[in-house]
């Protein structure tokens, strides 16, 4: 069990993030074209899983925009934005913000992602949604970085996530 903070109160999540060096669980998610996808669809690519409660909250929205911007020069990295939002919400957001470098993925059709990745919030007003986390995988789906953001209102450490991929990022690039 892990705990996250939302508006000053601690809430439990189901399990823990996958451990460093472990093989990431492969689960099915739904893309904006309503197709089932899994990590196997991105085999041979390094992957950043940006996991969050909802695309329609300011911090979540900013994280997607920042990861999209960071991905502009790194087409060999699959940027997977994962939430329980409907695929239509991801599609709308991508269109509104002209996002071309990230893949919006919904867990709505397939149970298990939140449990397998230890991000499903178990209690409180966000129960059933995902806690904010980033998991970085190498080409073979081995976990090379993981971050469970303690306070759900905080952004992930973008620089550390990219550093795990061997990519240096200027913090000024993160300004949107």
Place the predicted regions along the sequence by residue.
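Chalcogenol-based redox active-site neighborhoods
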Residues: 1-176
């Amino acid at each position: 069990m892990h705990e996250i903070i939302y508006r000053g109160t601690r809430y439990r999540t189901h399990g823990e993030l996958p451990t460093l060096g472990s093989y990431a669980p492969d689960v099915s998610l739904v893309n904006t074209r309503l197709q089932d996808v899994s990590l196997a669809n991105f085999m041979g690519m390094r992957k950043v899983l940006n996991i969050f409660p909802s695309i329609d909250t300011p911090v979540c929205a900013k994280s997607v925009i920042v990861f999209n911007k960071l991905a502009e020069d790194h087409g060999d990295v699959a940027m997977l934005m994962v939430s329980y939002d409907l695929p239509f919400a991801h599609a709308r957001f991508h269109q509104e913000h002209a996002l071309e470098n990230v893949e919006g993925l919904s867990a709505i059709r397939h149970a298990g992602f939140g449990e397998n990745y230890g991000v499903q919030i178990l209690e409180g007003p966000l129960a059933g949604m995902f806690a904010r986390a980033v998991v970085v995988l190498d080409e073979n789906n081995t976990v090379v970085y993981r971050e469970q953001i303690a306070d759900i209102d905080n952004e992930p450490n973008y620089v550390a996530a990219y550093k795990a991929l061997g990519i240096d990022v200027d913090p000024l690039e993160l300004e949107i």
